[in-house]
């Protein structure tokens, strides 16, 4: 559905794209339970997950970002509790974040410890069930990021890792000059409104691989890499990856500077 949403946006189905909202309110508190909890190791949740989102925004915009501003940071939900057991396997508290028992863990096939070495691990960075309240984690858990592009398009990333398990936890909405589309990752459906509201349709994807990891995207990635290995030219390269990471750095800098707009090319303030 991501590919189809981009195709529709780029082929005039909703006119010229003007605004994009990528909403990612996901139940990914595992970022506080694995090695990701340390900014120095992972770059934080905005890097782990947000870099993919910035890739999507850049894909839709098809133009360089000239300004990134962000508000958010670390919520009070996971205020450190030095009295809590260090890891889930040592804890008998009632907790909605217990590793391997959350709805998202069960859905993604990790309703049990996949690697026994994680259970034996003593170092924090090697354990996969650290308590979400364990002191020492320094990553951000939410952000609202606004992006302005050279072609005039505006985009927003609405992001949190403490969202509930829900059908609409990740959506992409693109507003064009004559319509809009809204894609829902979980169902794979695209709600398309075109011709100034005179036409509306729901586009459904019956992908046989949707029951696999990342809703079939991992299998598609393997197939695509095989085509590249066979000689097909990739549509993107290193430059696109760097552009996404620059936006991550710009967003993180803006968070620390109270929402100051940052130029992702120079990482300097936009005046």
Q: At which residue positions do the language-model features occur?
A:
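C-terminal helix-rich "cap/oligomerization" subdomain common to oxidoreductases
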Residues: 150-151, 182, 187-188, 196-197, ...
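NAD(P)-dinucleotide binding in Rossmann-like oxidoreductases
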Residues: 72, 78-219
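A general structural signal for well-ordered alpha-helical segments in protein cores
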Residues: 2, 53-54, 218-223, 248
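Catalytic cores of eukaryotic secretory-pathway lumenal/extracellular enzymes that build
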Residues: 23-28, 32, 221-222, 250, ...
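Residue-level signal for the nucleotide or nucleotide-sugar donor/cofactor binding architecture
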Residues: 48, 169, 236
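Predominantly a Rossmann-like dinucleotide-binding segment in NAD(P)-dependent oxidoreductases
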Residues: 1-130, 258
């Amino acid at each position: 559905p991501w590919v189809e949403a981009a195709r529709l946006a780029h082929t005039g189905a909703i006119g010229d794209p003007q605004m994009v909202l990528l909403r990612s309110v996901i139940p990914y508190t595992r970022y506080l339970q694995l090695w990701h909890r340390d900014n120095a190791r992972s770059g934080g949740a905005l890097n782990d997950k947000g870099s993919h989102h910035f890739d999507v925004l850049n894909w839709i915009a098809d133009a360089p970002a000239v300004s990134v501003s962000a508000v958010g940071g670390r919520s009070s939900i996971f205020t450190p509790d030095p009295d809590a057991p260090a890891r889930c396997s040592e804890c008998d508290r009632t907790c909605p974040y217990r590793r391997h028992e959350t709805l998202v863990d069960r859905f993604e096939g990790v309703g049990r410890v996949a690697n026994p070495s994680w259970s034996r691990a003593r170092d924090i960075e090697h354990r996969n069930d650290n308590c979400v309240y364990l002191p020492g984690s320094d990553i951000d858990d939410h952000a609202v990021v606004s992006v302005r592009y050279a072609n005039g398009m505006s985009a927003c990333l609405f992001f949190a890792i403490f969202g509930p398990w829900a059908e609409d936890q990740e959506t992409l909405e693109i507003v064009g000059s004559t319509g809009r589309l809204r894609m829902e990752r979980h169902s794979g459906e695209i709600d398309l409104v075109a011709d100034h509201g005179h036409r509306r349709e729901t586009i459904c994807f019956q992908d046989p691989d949707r029951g696999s990891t990342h809703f079939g995207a991992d299998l598609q990635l393997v197939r695509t890499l095989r085509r590249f290995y066979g000689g097909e030219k990739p549509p993107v390269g290193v430059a696109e990856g760097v552009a996404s990471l620059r936006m991550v750095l710009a967003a993180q800098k803006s968070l620390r500077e109270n929402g100051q707009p940052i130029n992702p090319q120079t990482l300097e303030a936009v005046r």
